[in-house]
UniProtKB/Swiss-Prot annotation:
The gene is NUT2. Residues 1-39 are annotated as: Disordered. This is Mediator of RNA polymerase II transcription subunit 10. Residues 27-37 have a biased composition (Polar residues). Its main location: nucleus. The lineage of its organism: Eukaryota, Fungi, Dikarya, Basidiomycota, Ustilaginomycotina. One of its GO terms (molecular function) is transcription coregulator activity. One of its GO terms (cellular component) is mediator complex. It is found in: Nucleus.
Amino acid sequence: MSSTAGTRRPRQITPTSPSPSPEPQPGATNGSSSTINVAVPSASAPAQVAPSQVAAAAATPVDAAEAVRINLETRVRSVVDLLYQLAVCSADVQEGSQHLVANKVNECIQALAALDATKDELHRAHMMIPQDVLEMLDTGKNPDIHTRNFVNRLASENQYSYGQHRAVERYKATLDAALDQAFPELKAAQAESTETK
């Protein structure tokens, strides 16, 4: 894929494309500073994740959550690739090639089982997805709504806390002024103590 003036062209899906899944960005892992090289299965290779790849990803010096995320991402991409390959195989079934579709179905089942096995790793790595996000996905809503609502709630709570802080500061200033007026000798003693510090 050629790049023109540093910009990437969007990937075009054609009937001969290996997969509709996006190509990984070179040297980037979704904004994280650490890089882990996990081989993404291609259309010509078996789409199963080898245990050596998982072990290699876990052996690199990064936090456990990042390794689990990369493992999960690799397995999901593998499932998407296999489903795409299954669609291509089943769209063009010819005499004597029925076994290809059956093999792809079996590979999909194995990849889905491997993906299901990662749920225990997610719990161990404390990668909990908020229940609201899962419910939004189940109802077909955009999960970005949860992020927007969370940020709006956080901003309003921040404004409320800031208002309380300002009210306490104003009360302290009013109290200091009233104490200075009621006890002038206390004001002089306080001024001397601040000068000595």
